[in-house]
């Protein structure tokens, strides 16, 4: 899925998703056109990160 779709599903803005990717928390496939394809595993990772943040864990 595209970053905008993932953003809508998780209620996390695209800049935060990019930061999570750059920090190595997400591992989307990079397509030939340069876009990233986020998987359901990336979705699950964001949900897990949201739970950690709710308990004041720092990233």
Report residues per predicted region.
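Basic helix-turn-helix/winged-helix DNA-binding cores
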Residues: 1-59
């Amino acid at each position: 899925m595209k970053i905008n779709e993932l953003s809508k599903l998780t209620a996390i803005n695209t800049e935060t998703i990019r930061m999570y990717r750059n920090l190595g928390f997400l591992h989307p496939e990079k397509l030939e056109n340069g876009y990233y394809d986020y998987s359901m595993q990336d979705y699950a990772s964001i949900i897990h990160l949201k739970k950690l943040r709710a308990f004041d864990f720092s990233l």
